[in-house]
Every structure is written in C-alpha cells, then in structure tokens.
C-alpha cells in the first residue's frame, strides 16, 4: 500500500526534474513549455495525494480546474509558437528578443 509520503516524494521528484529542465535548457521554447507542464502535474499529484489522505474531494476538484487551465495554456502557447516560427524561422529563445508590431 502506498502512503502519502510516496506520493509526496514522487511529486517532489517530478517538480525537481522540471526545475532542472527549465534551468538546463533555456534555448528551446517547446522544452520550456513541457517542463512547466511537468511542474503543474507534480503539483496536481500533491493535491490528489493530500485530498485522498484527508478524505476531502476539494483537492481533486481543484486538480480538474488546473488541468483545464493547463490544457488551454498549452494550446495558446503552441499557437503562439507556431506564429513565431513562421515569422522568425526559429524557436530559439535567444532569437526572440525583438518586439515588433
């Protein structure tokens, strides 16, 4: 039987991997978006673990809202990325330093 500590350790490991992914790869926007989504999933695992441990469904309902917002964020982020790639021919973060109208 898995205890609360197992889920919290899993969430902490996933969160740490996402932080490392953000700090080690600052060039590719797609990898940055994936690391942010992994960070959100780590937080969701903690919400579900505490919700199950305390016997309250509020944490699980909150996870559904977070997943909905994360899906919308991913769709909008990828749409912006496609437009930037069409205009700049790159997805490198260092090349996206100009603000043109």
Curated annotation (Swiss-Prot):
Q: Which Gene3D superfamilies match?
A: 1.10.287.3510
- Bilayer-crossing residues are 4-24, 30-50, 61-81
Its GO CC terms are:
NADH dehydrogenase complex; plasma membrane
Keyword terms of this UniProt record:
Cell inner membrane, Cell membrane, Membrane, NAD, Quinone, Translocase, Transmembrane, Transmembrane helix, Transport, Ubiquinone
Enzyme class comes to translocase
Q: Which GO terms describe its molecular function?
A: NADH:ubiquinone reductase (non-electrogenic) activity; quinone binding
**Pfam families assigned:** Oxidored_q2
Q: Kindly give the membrane topology term recorded for this protein.
A: Multi-pass membrane protein
Swiss-Prot/TrEMBL catalytic activity? a quinone + NADH + 5 H(+)(in) = a quinol + NAD(+) + 4 H(+)(out)
Q: Does the keyword Protein transport apply?
A: no
Where's it found, cell-wise? Cell inner membrane
State the EC number(s). Answer: 7.1.1.-
Its GO biological process annotations read: ATP synthesis coupled electron transport
Top-rank taxon, per record: Bacteria
The keyword Transmembrane helix is annotated on this UniProt entry? yes
Q: Which family does it belong to?
A: Belongs to the complex I subunit 4L family.
NCBIfam families found in the cross-reference section: PRK05715.1-2, PRK05715.1-3, PRK05715.1-5
Function as written in the Swiss-Prot or TrEMBL entry:
NDH-1 shuttles electrons from NADH, via FMN and iron-sulfur (Fe-S) centers, to quinones in the respiratory chain. The immediate electron acceptor for the enzyme in this species is believed to be ubiquinone. Couples the redox reaction to proton translocation (for every two electrons transferred, four hydrogen ions are translocated across the cytoplasmic membrane), and thus conserves the redox energy in a proton gradient.
How this chain assembles, per its entry, is: NDH-1 is composed of 14 different subunits. Subunits NuoA, H, J, K, L, M, N constitute the membrane sector of the complex.
Protein name according to UniProt: NADH-quinone oxidoreductase subunit K
